[in-house]
Amino acid sequence: METTARQVASSGVIGPTLSDPLAEALRLVALANGRGLQVRLMGGLAFHARTPDWTAMVDRKRRDIDLATRGKDRKALSDLMVAEGYTADRQYNALYGHKQLYFIDEARQRPVDVLVDRLEMCHRFEFADRLTVAEVTLPPAELLLSKLQVVKINRKDVLDALALLSEYPLANGDEAGEAISVRRITSLTSSDWGWWRTITDNLDNLRTIVEGDLQPGELEFGRASRFQPSAQIAALREAIDGTPKSTKWKIRARVGDRMTWYQEPEEVGHGRG
């Protein structure tokens, strides 16, 4: 993955967008990096970049581009996107640009969503200070969190999470962006009961599927996976359970499921006007 990014960065590719969504996403990240902007890939294409053997075997489609950046780079990134031929949704960006930007490649009808500083869906996590951990994508811990924060998790999200756990080790730190930081995950689950509730429930869902409900070819790499996902799930759950909880966590735990512990993601349309 890093070699690919460096090749794109040094190729000097400019002009029309590329037909392959992942190649185009890597091109945009490289161009942004060349201007001193902190921009990283997230969403489905980040999993293509991180687990290429798996996505190739399961024929996972590539289309939308999802990027992450920090607030201070928002304006410069917007200028870059327009210069590269993308159309900005001016109305949407004026209303929501402090947290999310939207562009589209009109010729290819390919959208680009840019999250600013944080992901806010069922749960929220900040990533502005994590953008330099890995070279191309958000760190593996954040990619895993982006799946495990989904309360009504679907099979695609489950398989994405399992693929990541099959290919990257658990570690206390980030290991230069090549490991899933347990410390990053437990920092959320030990301080926020809602995060704990959703993540532990989803880890249980992952374990159930990987231990008896996987369909042929769903988690196929064309080779042995680097790690056993069931062991990774068990180790992560043990770390979560073993991390001391904050006073705020303990107070919220007394309420439990009697109060909703997550947010319903808001759907907002795009007009590009």
Predicted regions and their residues:
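Conserved catalytic core of two-metal-ion nucleotidyltransferases
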Residues: 78, 82-123
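The feature captures the alpha-helical scaffold/lid subdomain characteristic of nucleotidyltransferase
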Residues: 1-38, 51-61, 110, 116, ...
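Short low-complexity stretches enriched in small and charged residues
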Residues: 18-26, 66-72, 95-96, 102, ...
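Short glycine-enriched loops at secondary-structure junctions
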Residues: 44-48
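Short N-terminal secondary-structure initiator segments
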Residues: 1-7, 73, 77-88
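A conserved hydrophobic position in a structured secondary element of the catalytic/binding core
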Residues: 42, 69, 138
